[in-house]
């Protein structure tokens, strides 16, 4: 997940209301993203799942 180094034309812009980009990965396999997209509030990471969030609405 790249927050500030946008690579045109592949970046994603999140809509209003869900204006944070995020990526969810499993703790043991951090190279494989499970899910990515837009969210309104960054979730807290747990023992099994790690969340990475941007503080912008644009990300790669």
Swiss-Prot record:
Write down what this protein is called: Cytotoxin 2
Q: Does the keyword 4Fe-4S belong to this entry? A: no
What is the superkingdom listed in this entry's lineage? Eukaryota
Kindly give the Pfam families that the UniProt entry links to this protein: Toxin_cobra-type (PF21947)
Q: In which tissues is it expressed?
A: Expressed by the venom gland.
State the compartments where it is located.
Secreted; Target cell membrane
Main localization category: secreted
The terms describing its cellular component in GO are: extracellular region; membrane; other organism cell membrane
GO MF entries:
toxin activity
The reply to whether Membrane figures as a keyword in the UniProt entry is yes
Which controlled-vocabulary keywords does the entry list? Cardiotoxin, Cytolysis, Disulfide bond, Membrane, Secreted, Target cell membrane, Target membrane, Toxin
Q: Which family does it belong to?
A: Belongs to the three-finger toxin family. Short-chain subfamily. Type IA cytotoxin sub-subfamily.
Q: What does this protein do?
A: Shows cytolytic activity on many different cells by forming pore in lipid membranes. In vivo, increases heart rate or kills the animal by cardiac arrest. In addition, it binds to heparin with high affinity, interacts with Kv channel-interacting protein 1 (KCNIP1) in a calcium-independent manner, and binds to integrin alpha-V/beta-3 (ITGAV/ITGB3) with moderate affinity.
Gene3D superfamilies tied to this protein: CD59
Which cysteines in this chain are paired by disulphide bridges? 3-21, 14-38, 42-53, 54-59
What InterPro entries does the record tag this protein with?
Answer: Cytotoxin_Cobra, Snake_3FTx, Snake_toxin-like_sf, Snake_toxin_con_site, Toxin_cobra-type
Gene Ontology biological process: killing of cells of another organism
Give the quaternary structure. Monomer in solution; Homodimer and oligomer in the presence of negatively charged lipids forming a pore with a size ranging between 20 and 30 Angstroms.
Q: What else is known?
A: S-type are generally found to exhibit higher muscle cell depolarization than P-type.
**Transmembrane portions of the chain:** none
């Amino acid at each position: 997940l790249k927050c500030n180094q946008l690579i045109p034309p592949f970046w994603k812009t999140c809509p209003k209301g869900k204006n944070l980009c995020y990526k969810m990965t499993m703790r043991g396999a951090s190279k494989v993203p499970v899910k990515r997209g837009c969210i309104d509030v960054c979730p807290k990471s747990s023992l099994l799942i790690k969340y990475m969030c941007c503080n912008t609405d644009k990300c790669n």
